[in-house]
Each structure stands twice: as C-alpha cells, then as structure tokens.
C-alpha cells in the first residue's frame, strides 16, 4: 500500500537575487556630469566648451538582499539635458574664423543589449554596454575664410545623432539603509565614463566633434527582502505567511511559490502521485515554466521520521530551481510509503 503527502515547511534556505528597478537622477557634482566637448574644423582652429548635464534614467537591477550585490545594471529611457555651449576661433590674421552655438542639447542613455552585466563582488561593469547619443539640439553659427564662408543651421536628431558609448569601466554601488516592512532599502550610485567621436558637414568642411566626461546618477531602491516576499508582491498578496494555506487545499503559499505557480493556481496536477509506469514508484510532474526554488522530496514508511528520497531522476534531490517536466522516485522496497515535498523559506 502507498500513500502520498505534499507539504511545505518553514525552514531556512539561501537567498537568491531579486529583480528591482528605480529612477536615478544625475547628480549635481562639480566633478561629474560635466562633458567636455571639442569642435575641430581643421586648420588648427579647435575650441572646447563644457556642458553640464541634468536628467534621469530608469535603472534595472538583480539584487541579492543578503549582501547588497547586483548582477545587473540595465539603463532605459535615460535623458540627459545639457547646458548651451559656444565655440569660437579666429586665426591666420582673420583669414579663418568660426562662431558656433549649440543649444537645447540632450542625450539619450540606454543599455545596448539588455541586460547590462555587473560583476557582483565589485560592482564593476564594462561601460561600453551603454549608449550615450546626443539626439536633440541645434547647431547654429557661421564660418569664414579658409574654412569656407558658411551659415550653420544643423540639428541633432534620433535619426542623425552624435553617437557615443560608455568607455572603460563603470561602477554601481548599493548601500543598505535599513528595512521597511518586507522591503530592504538601498541608496544607489551608478558612475560611468562616456565618449563621443563624430563629424558633421558645414558646407564642404568636415567638423569633428569629440566629447568626454563621466556620468553619475543616484537614487533609492526598494527590494523585497526575499524572493518569496517578491512573489507575494507580484501576486498582490504582500507578506502572506509562507506556511499559510488560505484555500485549505493542503498546499501552502510557500509551496505554490516554489513550484513556480501563481497564488490562485491549482497545484494538484503538480503534486506527487503513483507512477503508472512503475509499480510502487512515484511521479512529480512539474510545471512547464520551471520551479522557482529548490524542492526536497522526502519519504517515510510511517510518518514519524522523514528522510530524503533516494533514486530520484532525472535530476538531483533537492530538485534544482528551474526544473520542469516529470521527476520520478523509484521504489525502495517498502510495503507502505509516504512522499512529501519540502520547501524551505528564504531568510
């Protein structure tokens, strides 16, 4: 004779990374968000000016609340607005001159191929994962003499930007500032150098533009303290007890989460049952989307003591996170056997 039992118990398991996002604001700092721009029409007539950036960028992270480390920094819909600039030079006894104004400057900041990857132990990332494109702004002015007599009226647009990327390494730092209910709070700072090298035509003269500086943005971030709590937030039932069973079906909230199900899902198709192909064997059919946490299969001949089930295949026991499809438990020779699923609550 065989019997089945599916439970979820509130023990302890290591914490995994949790997705979170926030809006970062470019900081007002004399050493950051100052982009030095150089224009060079040739003939030794280069000039430089500095634009100060303000703006925001949405940032996505994958945070381990146990240590405040992230494996991801993805930047989306960033907008950095720059102050106006003027470039003017006269040389060769007034035989060559220009006066150029750049106004209403703005740059888009985005991750090129999300997700942006961060080394979690150091917070360092390759800055060239992120774009910095000047895609708004007007260039007006004149050139004369040896570099041509031209009126300048050009625009940066998304179709005609001055394109650049991050350069070298950037850093992202998360500093825990305390807990608020089910959330862990962080202050966040992301810093990365940027560089642009582009050209535009003024008449027949090619004017080179280079820009270099370091972008720094900061903000605050809230992350659920555990991946189970993150699931409760996503299910619109924040902080419901891990061992709670609101519908009385014998399957706890924690087991629903670990199975990769929604709070209102029917768990019965995914619980242990006799394996019709193997007498006295068991079968655990897992959801196609994969499990969300390790699940330990335990067995007992009499319910008094439990031990990890042996001969589990095709995966190890505990069942690893992300497992889908059928997991089988071979017979152990007992005339009577109970099987249960044990899930441990993250710290």
Predicted regions and their residues:
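Sec-dependent, cleavable N-terminal signal peptides
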Residues: 1-20, 347
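Boundary/junction segments of secreted and surface-exposed precursor proteins
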Residues: 15-32, 222-237
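Predominantly extracellular/secreted and cell-surface proteins with exposed
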Residues: 29-181
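A short hydrophobic beta-strand element
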Residues: 133-134, 182-196, 213
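A short, structured loop/turn motif at beta-sheet edges
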Residues: 174-188, 219-221, 303
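Low-complexity, intrinsically disordered Gly/Pro/Thr-rich segments
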Residues: 189-202, 323-328
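Acidic, serine/threonine-rich low-complexity disordered tracts
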Residues: 194-221
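Short, composition-biased motifs enriched in small/polar/acidic residues
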Residues: 224-347
């Amino acid at each position: 004779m065989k019997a089945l039992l599916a439970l979820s118990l509130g023990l302890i398991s290591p914490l995994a990374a949790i997705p979170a996002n926030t809006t970062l604001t470019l900081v007002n700092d004399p050493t950051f968000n100052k982009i030095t721009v150089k224009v060079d029409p040739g003939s030794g007539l280069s000039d430089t000016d500095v634009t100060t950036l303000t703006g925001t960028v949405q940032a996505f992270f994958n945070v381990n609340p146990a240590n405040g480390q992230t494996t991801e920094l993805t930047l989306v819909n960033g907008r950095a607005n720059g102050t106006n600039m003027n470039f003017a030079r006269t040389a060769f006894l007034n035989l060559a001159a220009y006066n150029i104004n750049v106004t209403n400057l703005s740059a888009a900041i985005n991750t090129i191929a999300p997700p942006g990857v961060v080394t979690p132990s150091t917070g360092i990332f390759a800055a060239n994962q992120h774009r910095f494109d000047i895609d708004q702004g007007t260039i007006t002015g004149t050139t004369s003499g040896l570099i041509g007599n031209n009126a300048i009226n050009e625009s940066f647009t998304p179709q005609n930007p001055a394109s650049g990327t991050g350069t070298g390494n950037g850093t992202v730092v998360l500093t825990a500032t305390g807990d608020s209910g089910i959330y862990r709070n962080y202050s966040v700072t992301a810093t990365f150098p940027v560089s642009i090298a582009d050209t535009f035509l003024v008449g027949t003269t090619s004017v080179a533009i280079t820009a270099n500086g370091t972008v720094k943005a900061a903000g605050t971030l809230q992350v659920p303290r555990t991946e189970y709590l993150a699931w409760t937030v996503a299910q619109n039932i924040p902080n419901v007890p891990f061992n709670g069973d609101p519908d009385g079906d014998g399957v706890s909230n924690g087991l629903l989460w670990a199975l990769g199900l929604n709070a209102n899902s029917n768990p019965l198709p995914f619980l242990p049952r006799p394996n019709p192909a193997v007498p006295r064997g068991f079968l655990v059919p897992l959801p196609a989307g994969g499990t969300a946490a390790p699940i330990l299969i335990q067995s007992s001949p009499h319910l008094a003591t439990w031990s990890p089930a042996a001969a589990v295949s095709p995966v190890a026991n505990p069942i690893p996170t992300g497992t889908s499809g059928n997991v089988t438990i071979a017979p152990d020779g007992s005339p009577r056997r109970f099987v249960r699923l044990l899930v441990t609550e993250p710290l």
